């Protein structure tokens, strides 16, 4: 029959035909997707529920003028299964994948909340940083040359060649926000700040280096879009979703993106409400280091993991990259194509513009920061300097 786009009616038909519900079951279906690239349907017959996700052959945020390969759905399904191999407690269950229709049937996580929405609403997720730190350590270690035999790693790397979505990252994260491109989207009040950003040659040179790292460093399987909208949470659970951008890339990329989105939420808050975000930033890194170190000692397959002096070098390189990638994410989420509700939903215009200027300033400082001895306190320090006026855009 070939590919066709599902509707709420045909999604129910599909689910019944594939045995998820009885033929006579009264199944309620709603399209619940709020993302940029896919349809997401929730189906419920009162006794059980499932999620059907379908990749569209174009970017929903733009329309059919921006075509995309539906093969990204297969990459997403495979990534979730790889993640589940190492940390099943942190991802939804994949029930099935239909490559022809680009349909994946997965566990319904309605018991949880989208982490971005919860953080905006002031919800507390005390285990978020522990879970994400451990998730990242396991996935990055076990899919790299450190924890995977080189032959297996090369085969796996080939499975996650993801040109369409990597191109989106290359453009929307590393290129477009740093120059005059039609994809950019920002308030006129930011123009002077942006002009200064775009004329900063030192900044652009650093961004070029981070983009080149993304293009060339195939160190481990990365989620590729690990922001707080790609995570479901409750006080006791954390589930990482939507790895359709998954590819082989730098160790520090996902860490930087996650931290950047916590910083964006911190910028939307009053000073006395920011502490929990820095708790999560710092604990994410400490749990990552703790878990990565244990895996290095106990599970390393690369011969040089026996050299104790190499581990701190690897960890410092990961941290340095995470700092720069976080800076790029801050800037692109502020003036690029895909914004975040943390900033855009600040109701007072003056406060919103000020927060966005601070995001641009902080992003610039993180990208340009150079020190081989920095630690996780760097994010708190530069943030405080930025919001206090010590750093100007």
UniProtKB/Swiss-Prot annotation:
Binding site for substrate: 225, 332
Summary of subunit composition and partner proteins: Homodimer.
Organism expressing this protein natively: Bacillus cereus (strain ZK / E33L)
Entry-linked NCBIfam families: MTRK
Role noted for this protein: Catalyzes the phosphorylation of methylthioribose into methylthioribose-1-phosphate.
Protein name from the UniProt record: Methylthioribose kinase
Catalytic activity: 5-(methylsulfanyl)-D-ribose + ATP = 5-(methylsulfanyl)-alpha-D-ribose 1-phosphate + ADP + H(+)
GO molecular function: ATP binding; S-methyl-5-thioribose kinase activity
Recorded family membership: Belongs to the methylthioribose kinase family.
Binding site for ATP: 38, 53, 107-109, 242-244
């Amino acid at each position: 029959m070939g590919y066709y786009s599902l509707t709420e009616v045909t999604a129910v038909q599909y689910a019944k035909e594939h045995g998820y519900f009885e033929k006579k079951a009264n199944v309620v279906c709603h399209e619940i997707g709020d993302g940029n690239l896919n349809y997401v349907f929730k189906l419920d017959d009162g006794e059980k529920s499932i999620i059907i996700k379908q990749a569209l052959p174009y970017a929903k945020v733009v329309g059919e003028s921006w075509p995309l390969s539906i093969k990204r759905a297969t990459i997403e399904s495979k990534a979730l299964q790889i993640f589940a191999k190492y940390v099943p407690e942190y991802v939804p269950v994949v029930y099935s994948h239909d490559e022809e229709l680009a349909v994946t049937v997965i566990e319904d996580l309605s018991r949880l909340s989208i982490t971005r929405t919860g953080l905006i609403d002031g919800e507390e997720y005390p285990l978020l940083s522990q879970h994400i730190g451990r998730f990242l350590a396991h996935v990055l270690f076990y899919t790299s040359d450190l924890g995977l035999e080189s032959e297996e790693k090369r085969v796996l790397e080939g499975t996650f060649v993801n040109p369409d979505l990597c191109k989106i990252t290359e453009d929307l994260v590393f290129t477009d926000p740093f120059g005059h491109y039609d994809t950019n989207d920002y308030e006129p009040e930011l123009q002077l700040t942006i002009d200064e950003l775009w004329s900063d040659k030192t900044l652009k040179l650093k961004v070029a280096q981070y983009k080149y790292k993304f293009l060339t460093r195939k160190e481990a399987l990365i989620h590729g879009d690990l922001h707080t909208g790609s995570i479901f949470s409750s006080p006791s659970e954390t589930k990482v979703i939507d790895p359709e951008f998954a590819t082989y890339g730098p160790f520090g990329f996902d860490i930087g993106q996650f931290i950047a989105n916590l910083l964006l939420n911190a910028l939307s808050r009053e000073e006395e409400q920011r502490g929990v975000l820095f708790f999560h930033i710092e604990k994410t890194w400490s749990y990552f280091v703790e878990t990565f170190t244990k895996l290095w000692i106990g599970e390393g397959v690369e011969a040089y993991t026996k050299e104790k002096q190499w581990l701190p070098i690897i960890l410092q390189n990961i941290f340095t990259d995470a700092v720069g990638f976080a800076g790029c994410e801050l800037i692109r989420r502020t003036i690029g194509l895909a914004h975040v509700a943390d900033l855009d939903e600040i109701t007072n215009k003056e406060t919103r513009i000020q927060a966005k200027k601070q995001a641009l300033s902080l992003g610039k400082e993180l990208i340009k920061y150079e020190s081989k001895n920095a630690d996780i306190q760097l994010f708190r320090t530069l943030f405080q300097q930025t919001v206090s006026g010590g750093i100007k855009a």
